[in-house]
């Protein structure tokens, strides 16, 4: 009995240890077809207090005239419409995969003309289309603007935030469902956020261990295909179990990311440096301009002249060298570079030189 208890404790400790670095499938992979779909439309915002598109903005005038014609109001040819209270806008929205007909979503409104502000405006009925050209939603409502603009008679103006754009909370109603392979496909495909052969293999093994052999198969470094239940009513429970399966992903490639503009350096924990010696020195060049006045003697037929005398001084700082032995890790790299008082710019130079020397076992990426 005691022996069995000890064995159970050992197994429990082993399971805890193996799950310390484990991650859920839902955190590192996305189910194919479950995505956000972008919608876009062109519309008119009316009711502006003289802050709309200026007279002469042709596409706004044409859109206004077409709208009046559709409402049964004839606009005589050649008549120019005053559009100071109207602005042409683009309407955008993100439609989630499982949102249904009749639900509402937020929309963003952005001026495309020379309107100064959309404050107080109302978006007229605007169809929102997907990439396939189909209408998936209709949008209309009062525009909420967080910015404000004011101008004086002398031409001075003050602008806070961006008044030429705004939002309509729940401003679009969904009119059509997005086709989704989740409902009709015989299999489910998980796409890894970061493609990796080891992660894909371990993920398929973890699924097969719980769901049965042959359930999942890694088809490449970025995708794992899982057999789906034929009954649609079982798929929700099935995916709920799948996405909570935990396993240990493969270690990422050793990388060093450098932002040359900001001096930011990010080094992954598995970066290894081969044996190398580093010495990084600095040349400080200073040029000083000193004015010199040349003044002639009294009663002499000369004039006072001011000239510049330049003094150039070059000073080299004697920085210490440090040695990176074979198998040096991230901690040793940071300690060694800090020991010589290197700045972020110096760190970038040192890392680039180490890679050129073949002593850096990592991919160096400069952004």
UniProtKB/Swiss-Prot annotation:
Hey, which family's this protein in? Answer: Belongs to the FlgI family.
The record's section on PANTHER family has: FLAGELLAR P-RING PERIPLASMIC PROTEIN FLGI, FLAGELLAR P-RING PROTEIN
Is S-adenosyl-L-methionine one of the keywords? no
Taxonomically, which superkingdom? Bacteria
Could you tell me what this protein is called?
Answer: Flagellar P-ring protein
Gene Ontology cellular component annotations, sorted alphabetically: bacterial-type flagellum basal body, distal rod, P ring; outer membrane-bounded periplasmic space
Source species of the chain: Legionella pneumophila (strain Corby)
The protein's matches in InterPro entries, at most eight in alphabetical order, are given as: Flag_FlgI
Instruction: Enumerate the UniProt keywords alphabetically.
Output: Bacterial flagellum, Periplasm, Signal
Q: Output one GO MF annotation.
A: structural molecule activity
Q: One Pfam family, please name it.
A: FlgI
Which classification does the entry list for the species?
A: Bacteria, Pseudomonadati, Pseudomonadota, Gammaproteobacteria, Legionellales
Assembly and partners are described as: The basal body constitutes a major portion of the flagellar organelle and consists of four rings (L,P,S, and M) mounted on a central rod.
Q: Where in the cell is it found?
A: Periplasm; Bacterial flagellum basal body
* Gene encoding the protein: flgI
GO process terms (BP): bacterial-type flagellum-dependent cell motility
Is Zinc-finger set as a keyword in this record? Answer: no
Which purpose does this protein serve, as stated in its record? Assembles around the rod to form the L-ring and probably protects the motor/basal body from shearing forces during rotation.
Signal peptide positions on this chain: 1-22
């Amino acid at each position: 009995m005691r022996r069995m208890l000890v064995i159970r404790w050992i197994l429990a400790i082993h399971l805890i240890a193996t799950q310390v670095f484990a991650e859920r499938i839902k955190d590192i992979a996305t189910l194919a077809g479950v995505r956000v779909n972008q919608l876009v439309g062109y519309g008119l915002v009316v009711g502006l207090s003289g802050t709309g598109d200026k007279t002469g903005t042709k596409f706004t005038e044409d859109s206004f005239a077409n709208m009046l014609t559709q409402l049964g109001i004839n606009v005589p040819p050649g008549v120019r419409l005053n559009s100071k209270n109207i602005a042409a806008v683009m309407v955008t929205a993100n439609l989630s995969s499982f949102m249904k007909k009749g639900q509402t979503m937020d929309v963003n409104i952005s001026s495309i003309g020379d309107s100064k502000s959309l404050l107080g405006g109302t978006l007229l009925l605007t169809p929102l289309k997907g990439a396939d050209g189909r209408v998936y939603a209709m949008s209309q409502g009062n525009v909420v603007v967080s910015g404000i603009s004011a101008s004086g008679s002398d031409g001075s103006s003050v602008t806070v935030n961006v008044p030429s754009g705004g939002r309509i909370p729940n401003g679009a109603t969904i009119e059509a469902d997005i086709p989704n392979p989740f409902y009709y496909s015989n299999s489910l495909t998980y796409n890894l956020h970061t493609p990796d052969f080891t992660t894909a293999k371990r993920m398929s093994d973890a699924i097969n261990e719980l769901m049965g052999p042959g359930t999942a198969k890694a088809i490449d470094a970025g995708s794992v295909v899982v057999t789906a239940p034929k009954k649609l009513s079982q798929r929700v429970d099935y995916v709920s179990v799948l996405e909570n399966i935990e396993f240990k992903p493969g270690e990422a490639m050793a990388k060093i990311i450098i932002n040359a503009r900001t001096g930011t350096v990010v080094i992954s924990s598995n970066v290894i440096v081969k044996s190398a010696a580093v010495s990084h020195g600095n040349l400080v060049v200073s040029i000083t301009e000193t004015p010199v006045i040349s003044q002639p003697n009294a009663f002499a037929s000369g004039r006072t002249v001011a000239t510049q005398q330049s003094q150039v001084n070059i000073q080299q700082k004697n920085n210490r060298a440090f040695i990176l032995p074979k198998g040096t890790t991230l901690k040793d790299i940071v300690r060694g570079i800090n020991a010589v008082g290197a700045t972020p710019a110096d760190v970038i130079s040192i890392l680039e030189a180490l890679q050129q020397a073949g002593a850096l076992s990592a991919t160096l990426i400069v952004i």
